[in-house]
Amino acid sequence: MFGKQDKMDVRCSTETEANRVSKNGHKEGKDSKGAEGNISTSFLKEQQGTFSASAATEDCNKSKSGSADPDYCRRILVRDAKGSIREIILPKGLDLDRPKRTRTSFTAEQLYRLEMEFQRCQYVVGRERTELARQLNLSETQVKVWFQNRRTKQKKDQGKDSELRSVVSETAATCSVLRLLEQGRLLSPPGLPGLLPPCASGALGSALRGPGLAAGSGTAAAAAAAAAAAPAGGSPHPPSAGTAAGPPPPAALHGAAAAAAGHGLFGLPVPTLLGSVAGRLSSAPLAVAGSLAGNLQELSARYLSSSAFEPYSRTNNKESAEKKALD
């Protein structure tokens, strides 16, 4: 009895121990699971905290980098013309803190020597430039820069002079054209004999002035006409006062026309004009003067129509003058 009871007690004890061990194991498993869960949750919380902190620092750095200037830039304050202060960003490579380079001030002697060398040769290089810089107590760079600036100034002055000369020449040409046009517009038949050769101007002037006025102011013209008429059969003696007072004979005008045969007035046949005048002068002096005036008007019209400055004339009667010249 007692032995069986002991066996049952042992079995019960073993079962109870097994149950107890299983219960303890289950509890330990629960505890371990809870501990693992606590560790994981705490680790996740820590990781989230670290991640959020790192993200915050990155965002802060980004914001700082966005607001701050790069290393190669800097900000300066500048007052504008209106008085307001503005902030501008400039690269540090400008080196604004560096003092400005002073301009080289040449003395009168240095300028004189440099100008003389420039007139001699516009390009001074090599040993000549070194020697010139040593004589003038300057550096070669200063001498080189002075010659460069002097060449630039000379080119600029030459451009201005050429423009001025072109303007002056255009103005002079315009003035000369206008003067010629004015002379052509004011050209009258009595003023045309001044353009004739000397041998023909005396006869035409005496014919235009008439027999009465030729005695007072045309003695030289009458003498020339008599000398021209002498080979035609007249006397070789000089003309007297009586003959000078009267109108010149037709033979004299014929001689003047023959003498003027070698001369051409603007390429126009002058002898035919003088021959027609000489043929009519003996019969009626007034009629001769009228016909001569008509011939001179025709001659002046031909001169104006054949002028080289015809395109510049601003006359409304241009077509009529050309038609008259062609007729």
Swiss-Prot record:
DNA-binding region(s) in UniProt: 99-158
Sequence ranges of Basic and acidic residues compositional bias: 1-34
Biased composition regions of type Low complexity, renumbered to the chain: 230-245
GO biological-process terms attached to the record: brain development; central nervous system development; neuron differentiation; regulation of transcription by RNA polymerase II
GO cellular-component term (any): nucleus
Free-text function comment from the UniProt entry: Transcription factor that plays a role in establishing dorsal-ventral polarity in the neural retina.
Record protein name field: Ventral anterior homeobox 1
The organism of origin for this protein: Gallus gallus
Higher taxonomy: Eukaryota, Metazoa, Chordata, Craniata, Vertebrata
Gene name of the encoded protein: VAX1
